[in-house]
Amino acid sequence: MMKSFLLVVNIVALTLPFLAAEVQNQEQPACCGNDERLFEQKKVLYLLSYPVLNNYLRTAPSYYQNRASVPINNPYLCHLYYVPSFVLWAQGQIPKGPVSTDIHQSTMQYHQAKHPSFMAILSKKILGKATILSTDAIAAPEQTPVSAAQPTVSAGDTPEVSSQFIDTPDTSVLAEEARESPEDTPEISEFINAPDTAVPSEEPRESAEDTPEISSEFIFSPETSTGPAIASMA
């Protein structure tokens, strides 16, 4: 009795899937059109939106890299930070900034990645040329411009003035020479003994009548007279 019951249960379990498939195939032609329309509408709305957005972003003028804003206060999100590789950089080009302190930050942060063009590496030849140009620019002397309004006087333009200034003797020296040698320079002796060219003095001048001896001595001085004239006067 139990054996026959188990056989019937196994047969029914094997035949139930096939019976269910046949029932679905019989009910499908009745609502096939509506299901296909709904499926196509969902497919179009879901699949065409992504290419349209991509095409719009590619054709639109974008001046920065589009990055979605990520909340900082959410502890369950894994933030991706872009770390530049300093392996190819020189030792002087590695940025060494101060350690950031714990300060207040906004709740939204925009993660931006550097474009590869910003990480261009200069060759050694270009760096050498740049340093040479900088040293030449520093070592070049600055020439002061000479204005045309200021005339430049050379020593060769005025030879007469310098010679006259050097050759002009002192009048006191000429007077002493005339007193020592009156025969050689008669004009200078006359200029010295002339009454009109005498230097005026503050004291009152005595006339020749009041002082005959002084006037005779002044006129017939032994420096300007000969020997016979002195003998006759005596």
From Swiss-Prot:
Glycans are attached at T144, S162. The modification Phosphothreonine is found at T158. Residues 144-171 have a biased composition (Polar residues). The modification Phosphoserine is found at S162. GO terms for biological process: lactation; protein stabilization. It comes from the Eukaryota. Residues 1-21 form the signal peptide. Its main location: secreted. Residues 143-234 are annotated as: Disordered. Keywords: Glycoprotein, Milk protein, Phosphoprotein, Repeat, Secreted, Signal. It is found in: Secreted. Sequence repeats lie at residues 127-153, 154-179, 180-207. InterPro entries: Casein_kappa. Kappa-casein stabilizes micelle formation, preventing casein precipitation in milk. Belongs to the kappa-casein family. This is Kappa-casein. The gene is CSN3.
